[in-house]
Every structure is written in C-alpha cells, then in structure tokens.
Amino acid sequence: MTQLAIGKPTPLGAHYDGQGVNFTLFSAHAERVELCVFDANGQEHRYDLPGHSGDIWHGYLPDARPGLRYGYRVHGPWQPAEGHRFNPAKLLIDPCARQIDGEFKDNPLLHAGHNEPDYRDNAAIAPKCVVVVDHYDWEDDAPPRTPWGSTIIYEAHVKGLTYLHPEIPVEIRGTYKALGHPVMINYLKQLGITALELLPVAQFASEPRLQRMGLSNYWGYNPVAMFALHPAYACSPETALDEFRDAIKALHKAGIEVILDIVLNHSAELDLDGPLFSLRGIDNRSYYWIREDGDYHNWTGCGNTLNLSHPAVVDYASACLRYWVETCHVDGFRFDLAAVMGRTPEFRQDAPLFTAIQNCPVLSQVKLIAEPWDIAPGGYQVGNFPPLFAEWNDHFRDAARRFWLHYDLPLGVFAGRFAASSDVFKRNGRLPSAAINLVTAHDGFTLRDCVCFNHKHNEANGEENRDGTNNNYSNNHGKEGLGGTLDLVERRRDSIHALLTTLLLSQGTPMLLAGDEHGHSQHGNNNAYCQDNQLTWLDWSQASSGLTAFTAALIHLRKRIPALMENRWWEEGDGNVRWLNRYAQPLSTDEWQNGPKQLQILLSDRFLIAINATLEVTEIVLPAGEWHAIPPFAGEDNPVITAVWQGPAHGLCVFQR
C-alpha cells in the first residue's frame, strides 16, 4: 500500500503537481486526520495525514492522479457543550474541493447526531471530492474594468435566465454555456448592461425540509463547497469549470463584467439538527460562532454563522475569493448578508476579513458589493462598510416605491434618494457609485408584481404564506393579480415606467432585476427561493418588447447625461443638478417637506426630468429654453418644442434642450 509523504502545508485543498497530489486541511482541535480515497469500484483506502504544521494537517500521495475521489475523517472530542462535534464515522467534504461527485440528499446517515454521536458509517452514500487539474487557455482575455460611474448591473439566475429562451439551443438552455451564447450576449449589449451579476454558482445543497416537501433550493444561498461550481448548471459536471470560463471569456470580449453572488455567512449544515457535510466535523469550534452552551449564534436565519474573525476562516474566505478571481477571471462579488463579514462579534469596519481584502492586491482591485445587513442585533449596517465596498441601497428601493405607489413620501426624501443617498454614503471618501440603487431584486416582488399585488402569495412555498416580507410598498391599482381592464393595464404600465425611469436616471449604480425589463411575474410570490419552475424561469415568449425597448432607451439616455456618469457628488452651483418646482423655481423649504408631489430635476443643464406624482393632470412650466421630449418618451423624428408640459397623473417625462 502506498504511503503518504509529509507533503507541504500550503496551499489549502488538493493539488496535483504532475507526479502526485498534495492534501492539506485546517483543524485546530483535531487529534488525527484520515485521508480517504476511493477507487473506481468504490473501495475506500485510508491514510493518516502525517504532516502537522501548526493547525494545518497535510500529506502527499505519490502517483495520485486527477479524477481521484476523496474525503476526510477527522478524529477529536465529542464535547457539544464546548462546541466540538468530531465524528470519524462520517466522511467529510474538503472545504477547498474544486469538484464534488454525488448528491446532498436528505439521509439520516448524513447527520452526526445532536446530543449523542451517530456512529453509523456514511461513506457509501456521502458525496466525494474530486481532484482536478487546471489547464485552460484564456487567450487574450482581459477584465473590462468598467468604471463604477458607467456600471449598469443586471441581476440574474443562471438557469432561470435562459431555460425558456427559444433562440438558445435546447441542449444548453439554463447552463453556464448559455450565458456566453451570442443570443444572450447580444441581448445584454442591446439592453446596455455592463455587468452580469449571477446568483450563487458555488455548489449548494437543498435543505432537508425542502426535499421532504418535494421542493429544492433554487436561488442557491445554501453553500456546501465554496470552491466548486454547482454542477446542475453545467452540460457535463466534469467540464463545468471550462464551460463557466468559456462564458466569462465570451462576456468579457463583449465588454460585460461578471459579478458573483457569494455566501460567506453560513453553510448548508444549518442548525444542530442539520446535516453534517464538512465544517462541523472538521473544526466546528473554529469555523462557526458558538454560544456559551455550545449551540450556534444564528445571525443569518439559516441555523449557523461563519466566524469570519477567526484567522483560519479569514484565510479560507480570502483564498476562496482569490480563486474565483484568479482561476475564473470574475470581476467582482456581491456578498450575501455581508454584515457577518464584519462581526467580531460586533460589526467593525476594520474587521479581519475586511482588512485582508483591503490589503490583497487581487481582491482590492475588483468590484465589491455588500448586502449590508444580517438578522442579529446591530445587523443593519447600510452606509457603514469600508470604502472599497458598494452597498445595496434599500433606502432607494423603499423611497421609489413609496413615492410612486404609496404617494406618502416628501419631495425632500425622494430627492435625497435620487441623489445617491448622500446622507448615507457620502463619508470616508466614498463616491456616489457606493449606492447600489435597486427597485427590485431576486428577494421580493418582481417589478410587475409590485404594480399588480398588494399582498404576497407564497402558498407554493409550503409555509402557509408565512414566509417573505409583508413590507412590499406595492400597489395593485385596484385589482389583486394580473390582467384587468385596458385602463388598469395602462395605469400599471405608467407606474412601471416611472419606477424604471427613477432607477435608471438617478445618481448611483443602478441594478436591474432580470425579467423586469420585459414584464416577468412570479404571480405575487415574493420569496421564490424554492421555486425551480415556470414561476421563476423567464418566459421570453411572453416578453413585452415595448417595455424592453423602453428600458434600453433609458439606459442609453443615462449614458448621455454627464451628471450621472461622472461619479462625483452633486454640489450646489456645480451645474450638475437643479431642483425646481412646477413653475421652474427653486423649491421652498415648505415645498420640500409638505408640497405637492411635483418636481423638475435639471441634470447637466440640458436634461430635464419633469415629475407629476399627484392624482390630477397638472401643468408644469419648464425652465427657459427650447425643450423637446426625448426617447423613450417621444420619437426620434420631428421633435416638438414646448414650454409647458401637461403632466398626466402619476406621470413623468424627460426633455432635452
């Protein structure tokens, strides 16, 4: 039997050097680590890792080759009250594995036990890691490096974006390959998108509860192997990495960046009754935030919370991020529940992971976007992230919906959100682009559902409609659900136009939810995380070409307005913006606070957004000059010069002089 050499303690994971494979695993509290390799017949062979450098266990297996399947058994104390849950009867996934063979099914053998250990061996059914070798020709690929001020983000799900697309070959629909297909790239280019933000692509598992209900985790926010691509999005699991990189290379050639939504806040091991896949059995005490009674701090709502203040976990997270940038050429990350990244346990801007990212020559150069909250006390941290980060701006989302759909927002608040929420983000040298403006996202109503439903309809999720937020700031315009009279359809269309215009012509970085530009509906489901079906897949055959053209014209218009592209804070008298009332006069303090919802926003002294958010048709006197409405609010030919705009109820128009 081949013996393991000591090998070396870096890098983490399994790495083939042409003659064998070096294996490394972190565990500060383990007493012994066994490497378990499986031959073609499934026969298991065990080797003690002979090297132990600090908290890194390591060994080198001569003659091992790519394709080798492996896992770990980690020996140590079973002391739940102390946070230790070692159980060598359970085969564990390498946290740095690049490929996984097998499925994460709901099976009692994949549990370690709660109060007492479950000593039933699970190697026969446990997923295995696969040793991979990396040879890929990037040709002349280069990151687009789109300036933040020019960035337009499009948030999409890998499968849902293309699974029903009639112009993409059937055999690649819903896959990584489809992202790089010319049809999809041309669509994104024509729309004006500069960055494709993908929901999680790292391998994830469906929660046992969902599996028992016949559902699955669709969004992917339940990670199990952070270095491995989710194989279900590949035409072939063995070629997933190359398929993904082919798509990125094609998108880069078109000038489109790729941003990954990444989950560095919890794992698919869930709470103490959840499955045992990896971290809990490798070093539970180090990887997770543990309470004094040995249970988890559940600051994520998912049962556990990664301890990103622990040096080894910081190294793990940093290595993971560098892997996606260096190996896959991704252009940035959106961090789910990112307040966890700054917990020490209190939130700090100089938390260890933030500092590591700041000091990394690779990670400090890519786009970083935070979802700036978690569910723990002190978890709402909008505006408080380090300067390198942009942040999802929920202030903008709520203000835009309240202004256009609830009619209860003062002009002053609306203007503040339109101006990149400077009261929130203008600090520590940050620029307006730090505000990621959104009206909708994967989490919540789609844009169409915002104007068709007053209440969530999440019954299909199996929780009796208890899940999902009740604070939607939506307006069904008098009838719950899709369809209705011509008048109803037109009023809803006008509201959609108003929300899109507010999003795409405001200061900050706009993010558009895929499908909003052609009227996608989830039929009132505002938490469709477990709906891998036609509820979430974009139906391109039913897309509204008129709405798509309207959205594309707005993005094109945005790129013509210097005040929106220069990424500088607006200052009084700088010529970037003037705020005027319906008579083209500066607003008084009373008008800002209590005035009618009528406003004119003059940008770069040449572009005018006239707003009438009242219930009545209102005459708006435009500023001095020869003004004409411009696309998408008027045709290209024969512009009509006007000095007064008859503003329809809940309407707006953009003019140029």
From Swiss-Prot:
Q: Region Disordered: which residues? A: 460-479
Q: What is its EC number?
A: 3.2.1.196
Molecular function via GO: glycogen debranching enzyme activity; hydrolase activity, hydrolyzing O-glycosyl compounds
Catalytic activity reads: Hydrolysis of (1->6)-alpha-D-glucosidic linkages to branches with degrees of polymerization of three or four glucose residues in limit dextrin
Which residues of this protein are catalytic? 336 (nucleophile), 371 (proton donor)
Q: What is an example of a Pfam family matching this protein?
A: CBM_48
Q: Which organism is it from?
A: Escherichia coli O127:H6 (strain E2348/69 / EPEC)
The top EC class, named as a word, is: hydrolase
Gene encoding the protein: glgX
The name this protein goes by in its record: Glycogen debranching enzyme
Residues annotated as site: Transition state stabilizer: 443
Record-stated family? Belongs to the glycosyl hydrolase 13 family.
Name a single GO biological process: glycogen catabolic process
What does this chain do? Removes maltotriose and maltotetraose chains that are attached by 1,6-alpha-linkage to the limit dextrin main chain, generating a debranched limit dextrin.
Keywords, A to Z?
Carbohydrate metabolism, Glycogen metabolism, Glycosidase, Hydrolase
Q: From the UniProt record, give the pathway where this protein acts.
A: Glycan degradation; glycogen degradation
Family matches, as InterPro entries: GlgX_C, GlgX_Isoamylase_N_E_set, Glyco_hydro_13_cat_dom, Glyco_hydro_13_N, Glyco_hydro_b, Glycogen_debranch_bac, Glycogen_debranch_GlgX, Glycoside_hydrolase_SF
